Amino acid sequence: MEREASSWGLESRDVHSPNAVGSPEGSLKDPAGNTSENEEGEISQREGNGDYEVEEIPFGLEPQSPEFEPQSPEFESQSPRFEPESPGFESRSPGFVPPSPEFAPRSPESDPQSPEFESQSPKYEPRSPGCHPRSPGCEPGSPRYEPKSPGYGSKSPEFESQSPGYESQSPGYEPQNSGDGVQNSEFKTHSPEFETQSSKFQEGAEMPLSPEEKNPLSISLGVHPLDSFTQGFGEQPTGALPPFDMPSGALLAAPQFEMLQNPLNLTGTLRGPGRRGGRARGGQGPRPNICGICGKSFGRGSTLIQHQRIHTGEKPYKCEVCSKAFSQSSDLIKHQRTHTGERPYKCPRCGKAFADSSYLLRHQRTHSGQKPYKCPHCGKAFGDSSYLLRHQRTHSHERPYSCPECGKCYSQNSSLRSHQRVHTGQRPFSCGICGKSFSQRSALIPHARSHAREKPFKCPECGKRFGQSSVLAIHARTHLPGRTYSCPDCGKTFNRSSTLIQHQRSHTGERPYRCAVCGKGFCRSSTLLQHHRVHSGERPYKCDDCGKAFSQSSDLIRHQRTHAAGRR
């Protein structure tokens, strides 16, 4: 049976007509009755402007074979998307021509009018509104109906149709590649009722995808693939690619893309989280780590952990020399420099070195005269914020640091630490010349000047010189009437308030400094230190003439007088 396409001038032949591909000789006759066959048995026919080739039917798959017999009860049409009863598909629409008697299935199950009928083609469903499978030129009997096409053919070994593809001949449909089945991006399978009944396409099997379904973006944007388009991983055209396999239950519809409101007009720079937890340079940026106690936020989680040690009192970093503990490793490194004597930060103007960079910055303000921190009460300015805080406590009389041993309070933490050495007897600062040790560094400096006979501090009133500035300040009060401290019990006057406090203990009997070994108490810390040497056997004061050592400086002075008397 022959039909003529309305617009293309191509002659469509039924697959099962005597002159079709099913002839025993494997030949195809043109309208003039001529037959052409190449060396390998492949048949080529030229009609109008179109060329197509039909492969030779393999042995055993002729239409006369029992597996391919349309009248056989086992035969079922193989197009799963060819459903005459689906909406929009009218089997009686104008232009519909029923298939030839040789092709029409005889069993009730294959009757197009039967409700149980389902087309078996696994890959073809026309989606274009203007192209129906039953429109002229779209019959299954067309020479271009080929289930064996790489993208749409049945994989069942019992059935292989030899036509090169199923191509609609309607004027609005234009095939992209006759050898690769339907290539137009408009002809995609969207039918949710798609159900494969072939034994090769049951649940869990694989079925091929068309090249357009491999590229969902071309579907969304309406881009039609070109015949000359090549894949990115090879130079062969799209039509020559092998079929893709995909699970049968997969959705073949193109995904929907949401258009951005402003996809290209971007401003600023987007930065991802880096080493510092996404915090931007300059201290600005997100601070996602929030302290659950005080609510302070931090850009890095490690900084939050360090901050929380303020609340918990945890000090995991311990000095191996003195066993002092710190909450941060940087504080431990700074502390260790007090034992090693390392001073890596040096002033470029005077050459003075410091163990901490903050001390160097503070020192450099002495050269520049810069004092940015001003007291709001008296207007006095300071070069460092810690000096200002210390000064402000003189106005508020605040003493937040108290000794746990004796309860004495101090306005500075450093003063409390120096005081606690009185109770522990610790004297970490020793003289390099005589070996004498001190609990405070400030006491070691004037002692070192005593060996050099250096007295850099001179009284402006009388010209007397002193080795310590504190001693000069005490002396200066003697020239200022009314700047003395008198005892309210006996009326005795003193130049220093600390001396008055020590004197008052003679009236009250208070002995706050107690020996940890024998329990003996003293009213002065210096007396307790001298007493500690009785238990330790320490003799830091050594005679330069005979080498004899003493535990107290007064004993050394008394001994040196014996040598002076002998020289006379």
Swiss-Prot record:
It is found in: Nucleus; Chromosome. Residues 62-80 have a biased composition (Low complexity). GO terms for biological process: transcription by RNA polymerase II. GO terms for molecular function: sequence-specific double-stranded DNA binding; zinc ion binding. This is Zinc finger protein 768. Interacts (via zinc-finger domains) with TP53 (via N-terminus); interaction might be facilitated by TP53 oligomerization state. Interacts with ELP3. Belongs to the krueppel C2H2-type zinc-finger protein family. The modification Phosphothreonine is found at T35, T189, T312, T424. Residues 110-122, 159-186 have a biased composition (Polar residues). May be phosphorylated at residue 'Ser-5' of the tandem heptapeptide repeats in the N-terminus. Phosphorylation might be increased upon RAS pathway activation and negatively regulate protein stability. Binds to mammalian-wide interspersed repeat (MIRs) sequences in euchromatin and promoter regions of genes at the consensus sequence 5'-GCTGTGTG-[N20]-CCTCTCTG-3', consisting of two anchor regions connected by a linker region; the linker region probably does not contribute to the binding specificity. Required for cell homeostasis. May be involved in transcriptional regulation. It holds the Pfam family RNA_pol_Rpb1_R. Keywords: Chromosome, DNA-binding, Metal-binding, Nucleus, Phosphoprotein, Repeat, Transcription, Transcription regulation, Zinc, Zinc-finger. The modification Phosphoserine is found at residues 17, 23, 27, 36, 65, 72, 79, 86, 93, 100, 107, 114, 121, 128, 135, 149, 154, 191, 323, 327, 470. A zinc finger (C2H2-type) spans 289-311, 317-339, 345-367, 373-395, 401-423, 429-451, 457-479, 485-507, 513-535, 541-563. Residues 1-16 have a biased composition (Basic and acidic residues). One of its GO terms (cellular component) is nucleus. It comes from Mus musculus (Mouse). InterPro entries: RNA_pol_II_repeat_euk, Znf_C2H2_sf, Znf_C2H2_type. The keyword Metal-binding applies. Residues 1-223, 228-247, 264-287 are annotated as: Disordered. The keyword Nucleotidyltransferase does not apply. The modification Phosphotyrosine is found at Y152, Y317. It comes from the Eukaryota.
